[in-house]
């Protein structure tokens, strides 16, 4: 065998995936693989047995998911290049934008391809400690649209809203965040098809409060 190589414990991987599948089955939610965190496509066939699809942070990850992982394909990027939109609209089921301006500019192409457009929001609710520089809800963050920046006129273009504010955290942080999301954006929920809770949920960690997650 050629070295170096990556060695995956399939039994451990499946144990974690079983935990996630249990959450899916008990709640009806969808769980996606965040390729930014794990993109070893050799095990994508195993992951596809348990999860609903994958998320991408740009065109190349979107291609990888389309080629190697059966299921839904979602993409979010802080900004898109105009020339990438046609391929993203072909490859992805959901294309999530970071600003109302990019949504207005590119969502019509996504909708014309029969796909769904979303918008990342900033609930302005920080639950992280020790690494404020990475906090999407931190001061001067450009990740997501605040309520003050949100323009209700874009609602006809939207299928859903997306937030990503956690980092390897427990479900109490999600509960706090959801309260803030509902307080700031709840008035728009009735017209939406979905709400994406983003990543950073350490669900497979020993001691994670899964019942609380499922109540959320």
Please state what every model-predicted region is:
Residues 1-7:
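Generic N-terminal amphipathic, Lys/Arg-enriched alpha-helix
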Residues 1, 159-164, 198-201:
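A short small-residue
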Residues 12, 98, 212:
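Soluble or luminal CAZymes and related metallo-dependent hydrolases
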Residues 29-194:
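Active-site-proximal beta-alpha core segment in soluble small-molecule metabolic enzymes
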Residues 16-25, 64:
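A short, N-terminal amphipathic alpha-helix
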Residues 11-19, 180:
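A non-catalytic, amphipathic alpha-helix used as a structural packing/dimerization or gating element
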Residues 178-216:
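Acidic, glycine-rich loop-and-beta core segments that form the ion-binding/anion-interacting portion
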């Amino acid at each position: 065998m050629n070295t170096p190589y990556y060695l995956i414990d399939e039994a451990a991987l499946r144990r974690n995936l079983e935990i996630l599948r249990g959450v899916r089955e008990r709640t009806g939610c969808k769980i996606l693989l965040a390729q930014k965190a794990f993109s070893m496509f050799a095990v994508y066939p195993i992951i596809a047995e348990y999860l609903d699809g994958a998320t991408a942070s740009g065109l190349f990850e979107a291609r990888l998911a389309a080629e190697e992982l059966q299921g839904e394909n979602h993409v979010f990027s802080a900004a898109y290049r105009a020339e990438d939109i046609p391929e993203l609209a072909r490859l992805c089921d959901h294309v999530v934008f970071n600003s109302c301006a990019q949504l207005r500019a590119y969502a019509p192409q996504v909708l014309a391809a029969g796909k769904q457009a979303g918008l990342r929001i900033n609930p302005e609710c920080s639950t992280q400690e020790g690494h404020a520089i990475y906090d999407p809800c931190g001061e001067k963050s450009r990740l997501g649209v605040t309520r003050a920046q949100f323009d209700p006129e874009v609602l006809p273009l939207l299928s859903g809203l997306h937030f990503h504010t956690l980092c390897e955290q427990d479900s109490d942080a999600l509960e706090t965040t959801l309260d803030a999301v509902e307080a700031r954006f709840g008035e728009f929920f009735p017209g939406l098809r979905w709400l994406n809770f983003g990543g950073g949920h350490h669900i497979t960690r020993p001691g994670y409060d899964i019942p609380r997650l499922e109540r959320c």
